[in-house]
Amino acid sequence: MGRGRVELKRIEGKINRQVTFAKRRNGLLKKAYELSVLCDAEVALIIFSNRGKLYEFCSSSSMLKTLERYQKCNYGAPEPNISTREALEISSQQEYLKLKGRYEALQRSQRNLLGEDLGPLNSKELESLERQLDMSLKQIRSTRTQLMLDQLTDYQRKEHALNEANRTLKQRLMEGSQLNLQCSQMHKLWAMAGKQLKLRAMASFILWIVNLLCKLGIRMIQLQ
């Protein structure tokens, strides 16, 4: 049973794509070298990766000479009147036209997303536009929901912090009230103690006066 035909399409995985590129590139360069050696052919191979890196092989001493030979055989000799500056101007003009086309396409897409200029669109384009709008709405809803959840979490955190601060303040106020009560009781005790000391001092003084008067009275009686 023969091998089935493999469908050629772009490899989606970036790593797999790079690995496949490296293997196929090396194989292609090897085949070009073998062809030039086995058949004594002049072979030139130019490869640019998707990142713009150049890989080349040339069986002759100069890639430029091989390219000039290729141009003579297929396109004729290059026009001598076209200077490097003119070539750059042409390249810049082409790049400008590409950018202009992309800009106009983006403008049309933006107008279509806003519901404008829908007349020229066919059914498939309208379906694609509808899918884009649905995806945009889903993304907007998801972003809005996440924003509301973040705000709710922030409010809960602030509420918890305020409750903690309120409890701490109440505890300090209670401690302050108890301290004031203790201080008031201490003042009362000191006041009572002071009064008692004063009364004792006055009682001692009065007793001393009474004793003194008694002694004086006894002497006066004796003198009489």
Curated annotation (Swiss-Prot):
Gene Ontology MF terms in the entry: DNA-binding transcription factor activity, RNA polymerase II-specific; protein dimerization activity; RNA polymerase II cis-regulatory region sequence-specific DNA binding
Positions of transmembrane segments: none
Gene Ontology terms: biological process: positive regulation of transcription by RNA polymerase II; regulation of transcription by RNA polymerase II
Keyword Transcription on entry: yes
Stretch forming the signal peptide: none
Localization, UniProt: Nucleus
Family matches, as CDD domains: MADS_MEF2_like
Expression tissues: Flower specific.
Record domain K-box: where: 89-179
Function: Probable transcription factor active in inflorescence development and floral organogenesis.
Name recorded for this polypeptide: Agamous-like MADS-box protein AGL9 homolog
